Design a protein with these regions (language model features):
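Generic N-terminal helix/loop capping motif
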Residues: 33, 48, 52, 87, ...
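Solvent-exposed, flexible loop/coil residues
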Residues: 64, 81-82
Length: 204
């Protein structure tokens, strides 16, 4: 799909944050792959994915993949979606190469299959656009240096040791969807690609 990116397991990053440059590269790769599908309306969808959502909620480029589990940092949604795409592309390619020569997909069939992989993988969580925002929350910290420098009246103790309460910015969910993530993602995609923009298999 993307001629200047070799899709191997090595393309799947394992980290807990992304630099501005890494986010920009991810967005460039994702945009290029989706544009190559040639689906009508895909450029309008991409414009929406990176646009300002307003009300403090995050777009596709800046959203995390979750509030406190996988990809819980800015750009985590992009990274998670790209990782799914890389692995799905590898699986599809390997499955085709294992077939007998006569049974292998022709070029146009292979292109259609890879296009579907791109749509399904990169957009499966698109319902999380406008889904996350940040708000201050109180949490315990057991950081020895912070506890040492705190006022004595602020130091508490529990089974894990001495701690203080601190206010940190944390992700919170603003869920306006009336049904599950899969159905919500399909509904969003079809707003831009039309009701014929997805195959039956992609809707599943």
């Amino acid at each position: 799909m993307l001629s200047n990116v070799k899709l191997t397991a090595a393309n799947v990053p394992h980290k807990d944050s992304l630099t501005t440059e890494e986010k920009a590269t991810l967005w460039k790769n994702i945009s290029s792959v989706l544009i190559e599908t040639g689906r009508p309306g895909i450029k309008r969808l991409l414009n929406w994915m990176q646009s300002d959502c307003g009300n403090g909620v995050m777009n596709y480029v800046n959203a995390p993949a979750s509030t406190k589990y996988h990809g819980n940092y800015p750009g985590g949604l992009m990274e998670h979606s790209w990782n799914v795409y890389v692995w799905l592309t590898i699986i599809v390619g390997n499955a085709n190469s294992m077939k007998d020569a006569d049974a292998q997909l022709k070029n146009e069939e292979s292109k259609a299959m890879m296009d579907s992989a791109a749509i399904v993988a990169l957009l499966h969580d698109i319902c999380k656009v406008g889904f996350y925002s940040m708000e201050p929350k109180n949490r315990k910290t057991y950081d020895a240096e912070k506890v040492k420098n705190a006022l004595q009246k602020d130091v508490k103790h529990d089974s894990l040791g001495d701690f203080i309460w601190e206010t940190v910015m944390s992700y919170t969910v603003t869920d306006t969807h009336k049904f599950g993530h899969g159905e919500a993602s399909v509904a969003i995609i079809e707003k831009f690609l039309g009701v014929l923009g997805l195959t039956t298999e992609e809707r599943m």
